[in-house]
Structure formats: structure tokens, C-alpha cells
Amino acid sequence: MKNKQNRLLVVLVGAFAIGIGREPASAQTDTEHTARFVGSEACKGCHVRVYDDWKQTRMANVVRDPKEHPEAVLGDFANPDAVRTFTLEDVAFVYGSRYKQRYFAKRGDDYYPLPAQWDIAKKRWLPYHVEPGTDWWVPYYGPSNFDRPTGPTCDGCHSVNYDITTKTVTEWNVGCEKCHGPGSEHVAHPTKSNIVNPGTLDAIRGNDVCMQCHSQGRPLSNPIDGKYYDWPVGFKPGERLADFWKLEELKLGTTGFYQYPDRTAHKNRMQGNDFVQSTMYHRQLRCFDCHDVHSNRNESNLIETGNELCLGCHNRQNPAGLKGTVSEHTHHAAGSAGSQCIACHMPHLEQTIKDNYVAAHTFRFISPVESEQSGIPNPCTSCHADKTNAWAIEALKKWQNVSPWRVAN
């Protein structure tokens, strides 16, 4: 099995491909005031393999123009449907390709959501509307999606260099410069000091690169020219996200649009809100220690799949080896669904579309006792759907209270 050091080397070389060894943020951003955005195509000449891999990822293909990319349209426009009241001709571009796909029309120089979304897993149309009182935009944009231009609410994360004044972008989708910052200086004179390498930033700033979009919150600068934004306007990689963005406040014991009672995310795009609550985050783990953002090798862009990823770190103290560790810790046979680390520590919790799920990123085991008290789903009865919380509580009493192994401190 690969150990942690080998995996991190893969991350830093393969995922970022610009160098190893951490540098102060200032050393990497000395040209931030002079560098311009040039687009991902400018990176391809030197980083051919990384570019080609990235080009196949969802990051590079979430936003598509259906006229240029008809294959990107996943919804059924051929058959009439009472939920879908618009035609493909009304669609200026589409968002999404994994859980749901949403459709947007152009009105003036802005884009607006159309009233139905495609549930990709169930292959069905569902209403796309805002439930009254479920998000903080209502006082500023009204309860209807048709009053909400995508510039303030969506486009900053689904593009590179969205200009809030001209409403233009360098490119749609998450391109190289979304994570590495403006690249003109680096393209002209490639050095480590004139481009941001998230892999060599400190853990907080490194995670901020991902959390600029993978978190729910509000810009500190709201409102801007009378508009309220749902992404960190002005933030660039290498800077502190906290100077631009305040994470949504999650209150213990409250069930709501954003959270379960234990503050675990109840909505998509909240991996960062989960992660900052975790021991992993406070131990300096970074998003890209697990995810290869340039890779399309598996569904979640993981460096390794299954238990291999977790046990690269969480297996050092157990002489029993891989199979013994899994069986001892999970009380399930190695190779079974219940023996997967993520089955208990990253359970899939229902998100905004019914029957669609997001993986919790607190890495905390949610006990059936908590389910009994507050109604939050737990991993035990999520798998053993025919059982009750009371059954799961009794079953866990027979387990060891302390894990027989931990990662070394």
C-alpha cells in the first residue's frame, strides 16, 4: 500500500504540476497586481497532460452552450412534460452534469433560471423554484428564480474572472486560473514565484482555493452597487478567503435549509462548511490530499478509491494489516459495503433534490442516538433500512468504544 508521503507526492506533482515545497503566500503572488487572466488554453503548451486530463473533468464542463454542445443537454426535451414549460430553444446555457441539470435563458445582458431542472439519476423533470424563507436571497431578489440573475448568484464560481461591471468572463467553467490565479506573467516567464501553486500554500490558504466555491456563505462586501452576491467577489488564490467571505452561520440543534441539527450540511456546495468543523481540517489536511482536481479517473476525482485512500494514513499503528484493521474497526467483513470507511464517516445525506445525496465532510460518525434525538440520518439505519434506531443503538453497545488504531499524532 502506498503510504501518506507517496500519496502527497502524487498530489503535489500530479495535481498541481508546478513544484514541490511550500512557499509563503507572498512569494507566490508577487505579480498579482500586474498579471492578467489569459485562459486555460495558454497553459496547455507546457502542461499538456494536466490540461488534457482537466479538460475531461466536470470542472471543465459544467456550463455549456447547447447550440455549441448539443451533447451536453441531458434533459428530455423530446417528450411533453407538465413540469417543463419551456423548450430547448429558450435555453441559452445549461449548468450541471452529475446530480441535476439546470437551464437558463438570456434576458438583456443577464441570464435567469428556467422553472424546471432535470434529475439526472431519476431521469425526470422537477420544479426548480425557491421554497419561501429557505435562503437569504429572498429579501434582495424576491421568491422567484426569475428575479435572480445568475451573475450575482452563480456565475462567479462557474467561470474564471467574472467581471461584475461588464458581466463578462475570461472563460466559463473552472479553468486553470480559478485555482492558480492570473497567469500572464507565468506564461511569459515561467517561474515558481509568479504563479500560485495551491500545493505549496499553507493549509488554510490551500483549502481556501477550493472553499471559494465549495462553501455556503456571504461576501463581506455585500451589497455591491445595490446587488447581493453569493460568491466571494474579488478573491484570488493565495489570499485569505476570510478577508472576502463569511461562512454561513450554522446553529447547533437547528434543522434548516443549510444544516442538520448537528451542523452537518443539508445542502449541496457545503463541503467547506463541513470540513472546517473536522479534526482533519485542524490537522492541516487539504482538499487535494484526497482529490486530484485534474483527474477524471473516478466519480469524485479521488487520488485513490475505496479504503486505500483513508488507510494510507489510518493504518500505521495496527500490526494486523489492511484486512484485520478493517474488520476490527468496522465490525463488518473486509470488502463488504459496511467495511468502507466512507460508509460510516462520510455518509450520503439527502440534499436539495429528493433522493439525491451529498457526502458529509465532517468525517464524524453520526450515532443512532443522535438520530433518535434530532432526526438526523445515521449510517447504520441508512444501510440497514429495515432496522430501527433502537436496534442500531443496541448493536453498537457490543462494539469497542475506542478505535484499536489511530493515525500517529
Regions from the PLM with identified roles:
Residues 1-5:
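N-terminal secretory signal peptides that target proteins for export/translocation
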Residues 10-19:
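Bacterial N-terminal signal peptides
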Residues 22-28:
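Signal peptide processing junction and immediate N-terminal pro/mature segment
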Residues 29-37, 41, 48-139, 163-409:
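Primarily the internal scaffold of c-type cytochrome electron-transfer domains
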Residues 46, 157:
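Short HxH-centered metal-ligating active-site micro-motif
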Residues 106, 145-146:
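Short, charge-rich binding segments
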Residues 132-139, 147-153, 159:
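A gly/proline- and charged-residue-enriched helix-loop-helix capping module
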